[in-house]
Amino acid sequence: MRRACRMIALWILAFPMASQALEKEYVAPPTAPASDQPGWHGSLRVGANVNFTNNRKVVGQQEGNQFQIGAAFDGDIGYLLGEHDWRNSLSLLETFSYGPPVRALMKTADTLRFETAYYYHPVKAPWVGPFVRASVLTAIFEGADYRAAPTLYEVQNETDPATGNPRQETGKRFRLSESFLPTTLRESAGVFLNPYRKEYLDILILVGGGSTQVFADGQYALKDNPATADRIEVMRLSSYVQAGLEAGLALSGAAYGGKIKYRAYGDVLVPFYRSDKAAGDNRNLGDLTNVELGAMLSFKLVEWASLDYILKTLRQPQLAQDWQVQNMLLLTFGYSYSRRQFQPPPPPAAPAP
């Protein structure tokens, strides 16, 4: 009993010591002016996790609560030279669950993201300048909906040629998405503002034009109607292109010498152009505005373990009308490595004669 009490006390004392972020939604400017840190720099983080996840209306992923195991990878590399700042990041998160009543290996989180960005920091005002960035977001594995008993699935926007009614399919498993689908490509260019930059708070503002290409033909999303208990409604997804005004805000910081880290972000795209407008679709700009919001809070328990909470919300009304919401609580065991390669200092001047 005393030993158990001591272990609980040690856990409580270790809990406020925090961790590194698992995901990067933006490629941010460096923590010091570019001219102060020339050369290559990068970091690498790999880990395994035991997670509790709640998914609600996430395209291609299982809904509900699951106990999971998985792996995470997060790496970045960049180059700083004078006013030029080039940054790249790659992140991967995979979690799977297995248990009753389905007793099948199911994926509950599957995210692969790559982003590259270029910032130009003018010498006289390094906190404001032009930027360009591009990113790709996809999933590696096939997505499916599993049920413990045979279930009737009804695809609302597909017609059965034999009956003229919505297509129906019965089974314990319904395929939602193929590998590497849906895939979202994003490009943007504009002006960045970094008006405040301290260890405890870093503010990054992005304003400009952006475009989005979503590849989703032949994929499906659950759109169940609670009033119909005898079936599960499904919607077939379609690919599309959008372009318009884009704005973003990212707040990040650290406390207790970097042992607690936190981050919140928001990104909005108002599409002035969209492809594949269906007949009778009279939605306005507000109805079609894309919104991405998220937050992260990370606690470092020990050097090799962290407790992380991640919230991600996504609104893509041309893909799926409902908000996609994902909550993740991760106990992560991992290893991190970082390296900076600075340019050598200039040789000393020759002594005066």
Residue positions per predicted region:
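Transmembrane beta-strands of outer-membrane beta-barrel proteins
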Residues: 42-46, 86-90, 114, 128-134, ...
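Residues on the lipid-exposed face of transmembrane beta-strands in outer-membrane beta-barrel proteins
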Residues: 46-48, 71-79, 114-120, 136, ...
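Transmembrane beta-strands of outer-membrane beta-barrel pores
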Residues: 48-54, 81-83, 92-98, 134-145, ...
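Surface-exposed strand-loop-strand hairpins of Gram-negative outer-membrane beta-barrel proteins
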Residues: 50-71, 100-104
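Residues that define the transmembrane beta-barrel architecture of outer-membrane proteins
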Residues: 65-71, 106-114, 181-187, 233-243, ...
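Repeated loop/turn-to-beta-strand initiation elements of outer-membrane beta-barrel proteins
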Residues: 83-86, 125-129, 199-203, 252-262, ...
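Outer-membrane beta-barrel transmembrane domain signature
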Residues: 210-296, 300
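Outer-membrane beta-barrel "beta-signal"
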Residues: 325-353
